[in-house]
C-alpha cells in the first residue's frame, strides 16, 4: 500500500488564499477543529450547534435539537446566502459544518470549504479524477460528502483514493489508494466515516464485477488498520477469516462466482454505537444481479444485501442479518441505517432502523442482530412478508428464469440512498419512498465481461445478467415523503410528490421535517401531521439531504442541490436548471436567489437518412452502449445528459465524430473506439431516428 504524505501547511497555498481576501479560521477555530472526535460528535447531540457527522451523529439520526426555526415561524424562512459549486452533474453531498466552516463535496469528488456565516469560499480541493473514469461508475460521478476528525477533512475520490486534507488550509496531508485490483472498475461515491480514530471507507462497482470490501485506515497516518470482505473469494485459496469460510457455504462454486467478483459492495451506510463498540454496515447487490447465474445451486449468498456488525478496532465480524437472501433484483441494503432506543413489546431495546431497496421497513436488535419486525412501506410483489425467523416469504414468479418479472419495487428501490431521519420527539422515521417501474428477465446465457447486445450497458462493462424492461412495466412511477412509526410498523402520514428521486430528510426539535424535491423545491412539513408549511424554489432538482446548525445565536438550514444520480442521468424532474448550488436559509435572510434557466427541448430529430432495416440491430446496440445515460430516444426528456431523440440533426448525422476518438471524455462520455464500428454506429443512428419517427405526432397537413 502506497501512502503519499504531504506537509501540513504550504506557504504558497496560504498566501494564495490570503491574496483573495478570505479570512482563515482563527487559532480558536483551529483548536475546535482539532477537537472534533466521536466524543465531541456525541456531545453535539445536546446543543446542535454544528453538523459534525454525515448523519448529524454517529447513530445517523439526522435529528437536530435546534428549535429557533419551528412549526410556528418557518413560513418566515428566507435565503441567507447561496454558493455556486460550478458543477453540472449530480450533487448528493450532506454538508458537514464545524465551528463556522461548511465542508461540502461536488461531482468528481471536489471539496469546497465555505464560511458558514456568509457563504464565502475559503478553499477548494480538486483531486483531479481522470474524466475517462466516469464510465466505471453506474450512477453518475457523485460524492456524498466528507468526514471531519481532529483537524482533518477526509474524502473518498471517485477513482478509489482516500485523501486527508488539512481542515484549515485544504492542503493534502496524506493520500492512499484503497483499491485492491485496478483491473476492476471500483469507484468511491460514499462519505468516509471515522470511528475510534479509524477512517472507514467502502466502494461501489457491483454492476461491473467486483468483490465488496471495506477498509479502515489510521486517521493520523493513513496506515491500513484492517480490511473486511463482504463476500468470499476463490474457495481454492485460504479464506481471510472464519466469516468468509461461513459465507462460502452459501455460494455454489460451480458458478465460479469469484470471477465476477460476487458484489456486496459497501457504498453508502455506516453507523457506530460507541457503548457497544460496534459499527454497522449495509452491503450491496450481487454481481451479477441474476442469482442463478452467479450461484446456480442457489444459496443465500452471504453477505449480500445484509446488515453486518463489526468491531471497529479490528474489523472482526460480530453478527449479520440478511434482508434479501439470494438477491435477484438489485435489492441493496446500503441505504441509511439509524440507531435508536425504543420501547418494543414493553421492553427498552437498542435497535437499528432500516428501509432498504426491497420495500420493507426493518427493526433489528443491534446488540444481537435478532430480527424483530418488517413491514412493507411501498407496494411489493416479490414477497408477501417475513416469517418469524426473519426470512422473506417469496412469491414464486419473482425468481422466474424464463419470463419477465415486473419487479415491485424495481432496482431503483422503494427507498434508495436518499437520507432517512428519525425524531426522538415524535418517534417517527422520515424518508423518501418511491417506485420506478422496471421489468427484469434473466439472460439466457451469460459470462463475465461478455458483451451481450441488448443486455443493458454490457458494452461499457455492466455485468448484471439481466435484460431490463424486455416488456413495458405495468406500474406507474411515484415519489412520496413518508412518516413511519417503527414500533407499530405503519405509515402515519405521506406527502405525494410529482415524481420519484426526491431528496433526503432532516428533522428538528422545532417539529419540522425539511426535504428538497426532484421538481426543484425546498419544503418544510409539520413533523407530527405532515402539513406543508413552507417552500422555496431551488432552480434544479434536489437529491441530497439538508442540514441545520447555529452560528452567533442564529439557526441556519442548508441544502446542496444539483440534479443527477443514476435516475437523473436520463430523466429530469424539473424544467428549471442551475449549476450545483448550496443554499442557506434563516429567519432574517435577505439574499436574492441566483438566476434560473429553463431547459430548452428541441423538436424530435428529423432530416437524416437511415436504413429502416438497421433498426433492429441498432436497438440492441443502443441498449448495450447508450441507454442508461441517454434514456429512450424521444421518450425520456433527458436529465443532466441529453436525450438523443431531441438532438440537433447534425449531431446524429455525424454521431461517429462524438462516439469515436473521445472528444467528450472531459464531460465523462466514454471513447467507444474499438468497441463500436462505424457500421454499428449507423445502426444506432437508425434506432434513434426510427424511434423518433415512430413517436412523432402525425402532421395535420
Language-model features: locations:
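Gly/Gly-Pro-rich "capping" loops immediately C-terminal to redox-active cysteine motifs
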Residues: 631-664
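Repeat-blade elements of multi-bladed beta-propeller folds
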Residues: 51-55, 90-110, 135-161, 185-211, ...
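Blade-level signature of beta-propeller repeat domains, shared across WD40, Kelch, NHL, RCC1
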Residues: 547-599
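Blade/loop signatures of beta-propeller domains
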Residues: 29-79, 235-245, 391-395, 469-471, ...
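C-terminal capping alpha-helices of c-type cytochrome domains
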Residues: 156, 653, 673-701
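Extracytoplasmic beta-rich repeat domains
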Residues: 83-94, 124-147, 175-191, 229-269, ...
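Electrostatic cytochrome c docking/interface patches
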Residues: 36-39, 597-621
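The canonical Cys-X-X-Cys-His
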Residues: 618-633, 655, 659, 669, ...
Amino acid at each position: 500500500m502506497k501512502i503519499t504524505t504531504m506537509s501540513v501547511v504550504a506557504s504558497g497555498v496560504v498566501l494564495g488564499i490570503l491574496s483573495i481576501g478570505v479570512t482563515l479560521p482563527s487559532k480558536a477555530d483551529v483548536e475546535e477543529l482539532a477537537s472534533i472526535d466521536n466524543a465531541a460528535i456525541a456531545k453535539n447531540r445536546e446543543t446542535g450547534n454544528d453538523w459534525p457527522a454525515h448523519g448529524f451523529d454517529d447513530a445517523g439520526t439526522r435529528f437536530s435539537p435546534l428549535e429557533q426555526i419551528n412549526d410556528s415561524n418557518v413560513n418566515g424562512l428566507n435565503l441567507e446566502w447561496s454558493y455556486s459549486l460550478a458543477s453540472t452533474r449530480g450533487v448528493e453531498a450532506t454538508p458537514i459544518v464545524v465551528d463556522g466552516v461548511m465542508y461540502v463535496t461536488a461531482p468528481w469528488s471536489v471539496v469546497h470549504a465555505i464560511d458558514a456565516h456568509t457563504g464565502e469560499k475559503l478553499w477548494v480541493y480538486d483531486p483531479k479524477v481522470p474524466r475517462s473514469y466516469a464510465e466505471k461508475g453506474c450512477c453518475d460521478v457523485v460524492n456524498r460528502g466528507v468526514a471531519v476528525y481532529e483537524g482533518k477533512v477526509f474524502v473518498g475520490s471517485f477513482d478509489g483514493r482516500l485523501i486527508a486534507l488539512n481542515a484549515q488550509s485544504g492542503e493534502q496531508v496524506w493520500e492512499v489508494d484503497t483499491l485492491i485490483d485496478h483491473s476492476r472498475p471500483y469507484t468511491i461515491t460514499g462519505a468516509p466515516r471515522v470511528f475510534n480514530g479509524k477512517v472507514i471507507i467502502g466502494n461501489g462497482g457491483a454492476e461491473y464485477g467486483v468483490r465488496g470490501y471495506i477498509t479502515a485506515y489510521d486517521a493520523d497516518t493513513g496506515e491500513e488498520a484492517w480490511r473486511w470482505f463482504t463476500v468470499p473469494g476463490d474457495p481454492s485459496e485460504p479464506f481471510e477469516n472464519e466469516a468468509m469460510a461461513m459465507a462460502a457455504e452459501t455460494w455454489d462454486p460451480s458458478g465460479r462466482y469469484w470471477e465476477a467478483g460476487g458484489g456486496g459492495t459497501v457504498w453508502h451506510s455506516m453507523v457506530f454505537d460507541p457503548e457497544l463498540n460496534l459499527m454497522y454496515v449495509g452491503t450491496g447487490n450481487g454481481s451479477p444481479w441474476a442469482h442463478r447465474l452467479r450461484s446456480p445451486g442457489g444459496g443465500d449468498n452471504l453477505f449480500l444485501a445484509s446488515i453486518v456488525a463489526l468491531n471497529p478496532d479490528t474489523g472482526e465480524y460480530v453478527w449479520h442479518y440478511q434482508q434479501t437472501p439470494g438477491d435477484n433484483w438489485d435489492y441493496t441494503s446500503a441505504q441509511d441505517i439509524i440507531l435508536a432506543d425504543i420501547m418494543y413489546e414493553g421492553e427498552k431495546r437498542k435497535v437499528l432502523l432500516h428501509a432498504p431497496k426491497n420495500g420493507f421497513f426493518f427493526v433489528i436488535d443491534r446488540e444481537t442482530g435478532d430480527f424483530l419486525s418488517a413491514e412493507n412501506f411501498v407496494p411489493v410483489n416479490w414477497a408477501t412478508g417475513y416469517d418469524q425467523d426473519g426470512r422473506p416469504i417469496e412469491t414464486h414468479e419473482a425468481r422466474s428464469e424464463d419470463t419477465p418479472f415486473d419487479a415491485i419495487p424495481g432496482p431503483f428501490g422503494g427507498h434508495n440512498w436518499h437520507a432517512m431521519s428519525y425524531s426522538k420527539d415524535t418517534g417517527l422515521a422520515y424518508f423518501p419512498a418511491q417506485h420506478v417501474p422496471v421489468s427484469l428477465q434473466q439472460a439466457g446465457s451469460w459470462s463475465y465481461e461478455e458483451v451481450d447486445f441488448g443486455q443493458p450497458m454490457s458494452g461499457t462493462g455492466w455485468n448484471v445478467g439481466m435484460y431490463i424492461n424486455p416488456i413495458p412495466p405495468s406500474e406507474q412511477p411515484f415519489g412520496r415523503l413518508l412518516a413511519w412509526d417503527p414500533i407499530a410498523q405503519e405509515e402515519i402520514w405521506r406527502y405525494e410528490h410529482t415524481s420519484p428521486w426526491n431528496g433526503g430528510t432532516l428533522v428538528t426539535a422545532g417539529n419540522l421535517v425539511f426535504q428538497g424535491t426532484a421538481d426543484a423545491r425546498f419544503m418544510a412539513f409539520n413533523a407530527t401531521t405532515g402539513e406543508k408549511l413552507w417552500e422555496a424554489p431551488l432552480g434544479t432538482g434536489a437529491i441530497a439531504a439538508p442540514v441545520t446548525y447555529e452560528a452567533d445565536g442564529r439557526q441556519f438550514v442548508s441544502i446542496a442541490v444539483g440534479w443527477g444520480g443514476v435516475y437523473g442521468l436520463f430523466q429530469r424532474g424539473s424544467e428549471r436548471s442551475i449549476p450545483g448550488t448550496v443554499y442557506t436559509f434563516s429567519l432574517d435572510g435577505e439574499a436574492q436567489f441566483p438566476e434560473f434557466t429553463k431547459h430548452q427541448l428541441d423538436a424530435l430529430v428529423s432530416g437524416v437518412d437511415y436504413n429502416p432495416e438497421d433498426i433492429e440491430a441498432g436497438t440492441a446496440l443502443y441498449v448495450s452502449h447508450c441507454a442508461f445515460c441517454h434514456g429512450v430516444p424521444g421518450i425520456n426528456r433527458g436529465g443532466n445528459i441529453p436525450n438523443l431523440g431531441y438532438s440537433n440533426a447534425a449531431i446524429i448525422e455525424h454521431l461517429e465524430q462524438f462516439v469515436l476518438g473521445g472528444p467528450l471524455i472531459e464531460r465523462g462520455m466514454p471513447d467507444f473506439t474499438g468497441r463500436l464500428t462505424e457500421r454499428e454506429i449507423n445502426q444506432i443512428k437508425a434506432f434513434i431516428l426510427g424511434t423518433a419517427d415512430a413517436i412523432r405526432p402525425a402532421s395535420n397537413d
